[in-house]
Regions:
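Cytochrome P450 heme-binding "Cys pocket" and the immediately downstream C-terminal segment
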Residues: 43-50, 229-235, 340, 357-394
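Conserved, non-catalytic sequence blocks in retroelement Pol enzymes and Pol-derived host proteins
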Residues: 26, 168-170, 256-263, 354-356
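Short, small-residue alpha-helix embedded
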Residues: 212-228, 367
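Cytochrome P450 I-helix active-site segment
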Residues: 34, 53, 58, 98, ...
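Conserved cytochrome P450 K-helix/beta-meander segment immediately N-terminal to the heme-binding cysteine loop
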Residues: 303, 309-337
């Protein structure tokens, strides 16, 4: 659906897929998220107690970025394909791939494949004349990028095949996940998706729901701790206090019902999404041939013009957000101006806005809520470095972690 340019076909696909992200469907996804969070917490507890890594304040040192990736990939694997990739349990970036359906199973780095795919896709999207030649260019950027696209397709083929084979044999599917919703979905004529279309849409969910969530959750984690470092006792203590009042001390994993309406948690998430801007470059939009063009700020853009709104730029404009635009200030969200409300677009707008944004917000609230309810952190990362492809990825995020004493 993501790269369909025909409006009628995009509308058809979106109507089918939107059922998988209805409020009722999203609520059914929570148990899968919680199961993966529970496995993640076991690993974080181990890091927090790892004696060789403890510093003088009993924080276990770790690079948080890979662990956000492992969790996000396992959750989307569970939701889109029927089982997690197992990255959290293994503690490394590795999953099964099958380049040709029915062919040999091999192992590939899913996170690296997503990264390389994002780089080559954004490059070829801006330079489409290179697309037919990409496979033949001797530059490793292109050869590895093309291989990454094949590996990602193979991951989807390997993960989806067993579910589809079971459905073809009439075996009942009791799971409540994205793939089950896609299997049940029908278009306006009553026709379900074909096998190739299902694999393509499941792959789209993998791409859309893995890297973006891992990058954003790591960005939120960093900016909360960075904001606390710049203004001690103004961020983390408020967040933990709000979580403690809503959840209590005994829970290891938060429930969505406990965190979905917590105002300071949501302000922290929104403020960090503003500062981080995962889809920083802006998504391209074509001025329709059927229109007279677009007028904006005294400029005329004729039909056929490709436009985009770079989220990072508008999220960091002083004339919109004020002189403290680069500061992490969750309370700015208490009194947003109309212009600020329009300018904040982490999920884009209109018929091509992110169809899974409700799932993403639920996931972020569960992840950040669980982290700061269960642990104390120390931020060792001086500043956050980023690598930009299709999305804006934190390079690393070194921190200390220890279990909280909530009594």
């Amino acid at each position: 659906m993501f790269n369909v340019r025909d409006r009628a076909e995009h509308t058809r696909k979106r109507k089918i897929i939107s059922h998988a992200f209805s409020p009722r469907s999203v609520a059914a996804f929570e148990p899968h998220m919680v199961d993966n969070l529970r496995r993640w917490v076991v690993q974080l507890d181990r890091i927090a107690a790892s004696r060789p890594q403890l510093d003088e304040e009993n924080f276990g040192r770790f690079n948080a970025m890979p662990w956000f990736s492992y969790l996000a990939f396992d959750i989307i694997g569970d939701l889109a394909f029927g089982s997690p990739f197992g990255m959290v349990n293994r503690g490394r970036d590795e999953t099964q791939t099958q380049i040709v359906e029915g062919g040999a199973i091999s192992y590939a780095s899913a996170v690296e494949a997503i990264n390389r795919r994002g780089e080559i896709s954004s490059t070829l999207g801006l330079l489409p004349a290179l697309r037919p030649w990409a496979t033949y260019l001797p530059d490793p950027f292109f050869t590895k990028g093309v291989a990454a696209v094949e590996n990602l397709t193979g991951i989807a083929v390997a993960a989806v095949a067993s579910r589809l084979d079971a459905a073809d044999k009439g075996i009942a599917d009791s799971r409540n996940d994205i793939l089950s919703r896609l299997l049940q979905a029908k278009d306006a004529s009553g026709h379900p998706m074909g096998r190739d279309e299902l694999i393509a849409e499941a792959l789209t969910q993998l791409i859309a729901g893995s890297d973006t969530v891992s990058n954003t959750s790591c960005g939120i984690f960093y900016y909360i701790l960075h904001g606390e470092r710049n203004a001690p006792n103004t961020i983390v203590s408020r967040l933990q206090g709000e979580l403690d009042r809503a959840i209590g001390c005994e829970a290891d994993i938060v429930n969505y019902s406990q965190v979905k309406d917590l105002p300071f948690l949501r302000r922290c998430i929104d403020e960090a999404m503003r500062l981080h801007s995962t889809s920083a470059i802006g998504l391209p939009r074509l001025v329709a041939d059927s229109s007279l063009g677009v007028e904006f700020d005294g400029f005329h853009f004729p039909p056929g013009t490709v436009l985009s709104v770079p989220s990072y730029t508008i999220h960091h404009m002083k004339e919109i957000w004020g002189d403290d635009v680069e500061d992490f200030k969750p309370d700015r969200w208490l009194n947003l101006t109309p212009r600020q409300k329009i300018a904040f677009n982490p999920f884009s707008y209109g018929p091509r806005a992110c169809v899974g944004q409700n799932v993403a917000i639920m996931e972020l609230q569960l992840i950040i809520g669980t982290l700061f309810h269960r642990y104390d952190f120390a931020l060792y990362q001086p500043t956050m470095g980023f690598h930009e492809g299709f999305s804006k990825k934190p390079k690393e995020c070194h921190a200390g972690i220890r279990l909280r004493n909530q009594n």
